Amino acid sequence: MRVPIVAPTVLLGGAGLGALVTVVTLLPGPVGLAAAAGVLCCGVFLLWPWAVLPVGIIGGAVIGAMLSGGDVRGFIAVKMLLLAAGGVALAVRHWLRVERPAGRTPADVGMLCLIGLTVVAAIYGLAVGNQAEEVLVAAYQMATIPVYFFVATHTLTTTRRILAAGVLYVVLAGVFTALAVTTPGRHGGLITLMAVPPLIWAAGRLRGWRRNGVLLLAGFFAVDVLLASYRGIWLAAALALLIMLVRGGRAVRTGLAATAAAGVAVAAVLALQPGVRDRSGEIAKGLAQSAGYRGAESSVGLGVFADQPLVGAGLGQSTPGVYLSGFTLTDVGPVYHAFYVTVLANIGLVGLLLVLWPILRSVRVGLGSRNGITLPFAALSCGFLAAAVFAAPTDGHWELGLLPALTLLTAEQEGAPLRRFAGALLHRPVHRTGVTV
């Protein structure tokens, strides 16, 4: 539903928002700053709900890294604040009846079951004596997947919103990567990898300067993924591209070949920068790096799973006094460096099935298309499922919630040319304030 926002409404709303931000900044310490940021973001998301995920993912990563000082809890808190602001904005839009109801997807039931299991497993973990803080940490790891799934299905409800969110994501990711690509020691690549397969798909369909621009971005992001020096990201990227090569049609393969050529050209230009050369020297180190203590850590988690294979030891389980090379004696759990070990130790086989069920269902839908936009999202899902064997990001596998949602949401638009998407965005009606909701 599109509702015109007239100028007086915008002026009054902006004045009220400014007054509220001014008031909350008077709160003591970082609480006031966080409250002001939350209110401001809520106002933005109230007008543009499709911006919740791009801002939450990239803005959360950048702002969280700046403010957390290396503390994972602070990093996660920033991301959760942005998502919470989006949730409040969405609730207000529904209350004002300017938001259309979200459609149902085949994965909704599976994601709801995962939320229910997380609640039950948290209660069970507290009942058996697991520490409340550890229960909260483990619950976050599990709940991240369905939370991002439902945020996507409730904010990206139209083709126009999906495209607008994608454009904003690529712009923010491009700015962030351009500023950081020459910084030695920067690892990651997740943000840029999320954009590469969809850009490859677009490059196979567009023509002229639009295609050249998309190829430039895709090649630039691909180089950043290569410089990430993170084997989990490399595995996810390699498997996703392989699936697109094998399953994709002519247009997809054309996009792959053109992106590969663009990546080589971009790499040649970036190699002139000393910072990029320093980062490229870390690639060999990333390949040769040993698993270190992670193997011993995973064996502890698998031992916990072997004792209680069906439902695990409850969220927040931890094994105290374990010797790990380089750490002497330490507590192991509830989060391990292998995501599946985390799942098996905390919620057992039942939890693993509930985690995989909705994701694999979306993959089945996405891989059924040879030239549709669902293919790159499904291919990325497969890549990250494989990488999760030995990778567990501290902020959770949010991509395993977002990608299935994008796969199922775009499946409804199968066969619609990208140019029609772009035309709908560029030629949408503009009201007196220039704002459309």
Model-derived regions: residue spans:
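Transmembrane alpha-helices of multi-pass inner-membrane enzymes
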Residues: 377-388, 393-437
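N-terminal signal-anchor transmembrane segment
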Residues: 2-94, 120-124, 179-186, 384
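Long extracytoplasmic/lumenal interhelical loops at the membrane interface
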Residues: 277, 281-299, 303-307, 311-347, ...
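Hydrophobic transmembrane alpha-helices and their immediate junctions
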Residues: 210, 346-384, 418
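Hydrophobic, aromatic-rich transmembrane alpha-helices
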Residues: 35-46, 83-97, 195-206, 349-369
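Alpha-helical transmembrane segments of multi-pass inner-membrane proteins
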Residues: 38, 115, 119-124, 143-247
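Aromatic-anchored transmembrane helix interface
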Residues: 75-87, 106-121, 131-151
